[in-house]
Amino acid sequence: QMSAGYDDKSPAMPVPGPMGPMGPRGPPGSPGASGPQGFTGPPGEPGEAGPSGAMGPRGPAGPPGKNGEDGESGKPGRGGERGPPGPQGARGFSGLDGAKGDSGPAGPKGESGAPGENGTPGAMGPRGNDGAAGAAGPPGPTGPAGPPGFPGGPGAKGDAGAQGGRGPEGPAGARGEPGNPGPAGAAGPSGNPGTDGAAGPKGTPGAAGVAGAPGFPGPRGPSGPQGAAGAPGPKGNTGEVGAPGAKGEAGAKGEAGAPGVQGPPGPSGEEGKRGARGEPGAAGARGGPGGRGFPGSDGPAGPKGATGERGAPGAVGPKGATGEPGRTGEPGLPGAKGMTGSPGSPGPDGKTGAAGPSGQDGRPGPPGPVGARGQPGVMGFPGPKGAAGEGGKPGERGVMGPTGAAGAPGKDGDVGAPGPSGPAGPAGERXXXGPAGAPGFQGLPGPGEQGLPGEAGATGPAGARGAPGALGPAGARGSPGSSGNDGAKGDAGAPGAPGAQGPPGLQGMPGERGAAGLPGLRGDRGDQGAKGADGAPGKDGPRGLTGPLGLPGPAGATGDKGEPGPAGPVGPGGARGAPGERGESGPPGPAGFAGPPGADGQPGAKGEAGDNGAKGDAGPPGAAGPTGAPGPQGPVGNTGPKGARGAAGPPGATGFPGAAGRVGPPGPSGNPGPPGPAGGTGKEGPKGNRGETGPAGRTGEVGAAGPPGPAGEKGSPGAEGATGSAGLPGPQVGLPGQRGERXXPGLPGPAGEPGKPGPSGPGGERGPPGPMGPPGLAGAPGEPGREGSPGNEGSAGRDGAAGPKGDRGESGPSGAPGAPGPPGAPGPVGPAGKNGDRGETGPAGPAGSAGPAGPRGPAGAPGLRGDKGESGEAGERGFTGMQGPPGPSGSSGEQGPAGAAGPAGPRGPAGSAGSPGKDGMSGLPGPTGPPGPRGGFDLGFLSQPQEKAPDPFRDRDLEVDSTLKSLSQQLEQLRSPDGTRSGEYWLDPDQGCTEDALKFTYSVLEDGCTSHTGTWGK
């Protein structure tokens, strides 16, 4: 068009001369009209990755990838609730380490991803401070009836109840042991007749003997029929905690709790191991058109045209009007890769990343100082049935718990112990009589006020004991009496030999939480727990270290185009690109006329920003950018190898009360209560067995002479008299004389031998009933009751209040270098150079050879926007986003079965002496001794003052008692040591070979503190 302009001014058409040399480059023309659309150029090199689009919706889960190797353990996270043990998974294969990819630029923050699945529970964190007490929860379901409690303390005496009906006749009691010798009884029946005495006067009747001591109380009669309901008694003390019930059925899954308060940031985890290299991601969607490339350098001069004929030089024409702008040139080829830019300034701190994975358990540290007293642990499973323990003292009254919500009705439990009397209800209609309940434990008698006077009772008991009569002679030694009450606790005896291990005791109440124990040896990894209940989302943790690239997730669906972000700061100018490839030769243009050199123009306005240069090499890692939104959940990895056993979780909430345990054996007898009021006269009991013959009574005073006895037998002939001197010879035999008179009786002969005892006389009248024997021994324990059926599910408890902020964790190790920061702001524009001086206009000379090219004219107005190029190839894959926040926990699985009982521990050292036991039962009577020599009888001792001789057996009894008590104390101290003795003990972790046992020393220091020190065994 320039040449056309000159033609218009020419007066004549000269013959064209040969083409002159190429003139200097003319100033840029004005923009030309838009040309027709050019052909689609070849695809450009991939442009730089554009800014990330908004996060698309979460794509479907991809197939599970292979597991990477276990990362190194992070610091303990906050304690998760301990799930029940799950089944043990198989060990997966270790993935290969991938090579580290180049760091991509940080993309803009995406929208928050969907919550990821729950992470595995972290190791138990340090114990937080006690939280404030939560609000009272809704009432829990009614638990099954607990076992009968121990007898409570004496209650206030209630009003006298109505007199119950007379109970049925009790069975005859067992035969009691002989009582102590009573005072002398009245004279026995007459003996066999003595030898005749002189008849004496009748003696006066003896004084009545002293009344015998009251007999022992009879055995307890069966319960009478139920009396009318008494007025409600005061509320009793809280019973002892029942034994844990059998495992309940799994409760229904509770609704997800409201999110808890954001927790404080957890401590930084340690850097995880490098993950395995991810598989290549799927090809991304085709990118948008790349930015316009820099203009290529000038192409080489075209081939020289044929030389035209030289024209006559024309006069210099005036400067033509600015031509229309030319068509937009084809996009130049992309420039070579620019030099690496200088690192940008560090970006702002990113959001706190998720806590890293748990680290492996470290070696056991040295014992820490004794921690604060922990909360009570979870109630254990019921232990085996132990021997009956001694009755404990009544505990202090517990705080009243909140009322629980009514649960679903449970299955019928065993008959419970009688509860306290309720207030009297309205009188119901008469119903059929129900079955009698099991008798409850005997309560301690309570002190009370005077009851209302009852109706006139039957004949009262025997009157007050009279003054003691004269002391009778010592009777035969009676059988040993029943054992007395425990004496006062004696001093501790010398330590006895260790006794055999006793049967396990009943499960005690949970003790207060002890001080923190020494770190145990590392146990085997527990089975994988089932998914825990949903936890409340925690607060953002502190920023974690940049994790290794995750496996690529499946491509998400294309998201909607995000709103345009605010313009970023201008990047620094890239280094000058290398010259582009040589362009194709353009067609030779017509020769322009050389214009005179124009004066230097003023500096042009600042040009528009050039197109983006090609992607530079990866710069050094910048400071970590802000945390991106969580990427989509990666596929589930293979199961890792079995990890170390985690630390014990914090104590769980107290479980529901267990089902009632079996009835334990009867406890020891309580101290005898004060005597109850006199009962009504019972029916006459059955005839008792005949009592043993009592000891001989005191000899009575000599009675008066009896009436004369019958005539004695004729005495034996007397001795022959001495021979008289011979008489005179009588007459011849005379006639027989008359019978003489009866002679007087002869002198009484000596007393005959006593006759043999006569046959036993008829049975005497029935004697008075003997004293009541002592109560019989406790019967054998009843058969255990059937196990109660489990109660219905309880309703889920409310979420507890958020705990207080935990203590600050220890600082983690220094993190790895962060990802590159965003580019720094461009440096300030340098000052413009000074304008050169304007040259003077020279005279117009003849057309010389072409002058040097003038300075480049100012840029033309921008051309119209070219057509959209084809999409560039997909850019390199960006970094995986940070892990999303943990999703809500799944419902808790059913509780696993209880583990098998562990092996028995090694036998402990002998404890100090136990307290002495109660007096033992009396032994059987010994065999009868040989008869002693027959003694005489001396009444002289009756006149001497009577004193009881020392009991030769008593000293030996005391010795046995003290030994028993000392042994009992030693056993008691073995069972529950009081922590006042220093000493050494061993712990064998696997209870097998003793080579790995640990020896500990327990020291009680002077200030009351204690210390544990441990040493390895061989």
From Swiss-Prot:
GO terms for cellular component: collagen trimer; extracellular matrix; extracellular space. One of its GO terms (biological process) is extracellular matrix organization. Residues 1-10, 67-81, 865-876, 948-959 have a biased composition (Basic and acidic residues). It is found in: Secreted, Extracellular space, Extracellular matrix. Keywords: Collagen, Disulfide bond, Extracellular matrix, Secreted. Residues 1-991 are annotated as: Disordered. InterPro entries: Collagen, Collagen_superfamily, Fib_collagen_C. Residues 963-973 have a biased composition (Polar residues). It comes from the Eukaryota. Gene3D superfamilies: 2.60.120.1000. It holds the Pfam family Collagen. Residues 152-170, 284-296, 568-577 have a biased composition (Gly residues). Residues 13-30, 138-151, 665-677, 819-829 have a biased composition (Pro residues). GO terms for molecular function: extracellular matrix structural constituent conferring tensile strength. Residues 31-58, 126-136, 171-214, 223-261, 370-385, 424-442, 452-510, 543-558, 591-627, 641-663, 701-746, 775-795, 843-862, 889-925 have a biased composition (Low complexity). PANTHER family: COL_CUTICLE_N DOMAIN-CONTAINING PROTEIN-RELATED, COLLAGEN ALPHA. Belongs to the fibrillar collagen family. This is Collagen, type I, alpha 1a. It comes from Epinephelus costae. The lineage of its organism: Eukaryota, Metazoa, Chordata, Craniata, Vertebrata.
